[in-house]
UniProtKB/Swiss-Prot annotation:
One of its GO terms (molecular function) is acylphosphatase activity. It is an enzyme of class 3 (hydrolase). This is Acylphosphatase. Coiled coil: none annotated. The active site is at residues 18, 36. PANTHER family: ACYLPHOSPHATASE. Belongs to the acylphosphatase family. Gene3D superfamilies: 3.30.70.100. Residues 3-92 form the Acylphosphatase-like domain. It catalyses: an acyl phosphate + H2O = a carboxylate + phosphate + H(+). SUPFAM superfamilies: Acylphosphatase/BLUF domain-like.
């Protein structure tokens, strides 16, 4: 099991990025969350098998059709700082 904390920059709010991320993460059997940041970025915590997380990170560079991803910052995540472990992937 691996956990990644992700910040996505670009045109990623108001284009369905969070709903798309939830659908894609669920399809890959990942748990965690995704949310909008006040500065216009999207933040996510991804948990799951390493290959599935890597695949999701690759997909996040593209995003949904209306998104324009400029940059993704990925750090090793620690879910302990973000509350109890989730059993699903949610938009917060």
């Amino acid at each position: 099991m691996t956990t990644k904390h992700v910040l996505v920059s670009g045109i990623v709010q108001g284009v369905g990025y969070r709903a798309w991320a939830r659908q894609e993460a669920t399809r890959r059997n990942l748990t965690g969350w995704v949310r909008n940041c006040a500065d216009g970025r999207v933040e996510a915590l991804l948990e799951g098998e390493a290959d599935a997380v890597d695949d999701m990170l690759n997909a996040m560079h593209q995003g949904p059709a209306l998104a324009q991803v400029d940059r993704i910052l990925v750090e090793e995540g620690n879910n302990d700082d973000d509350g109890p472990r989730s059993t699903h992937f949610e938009v917060t």
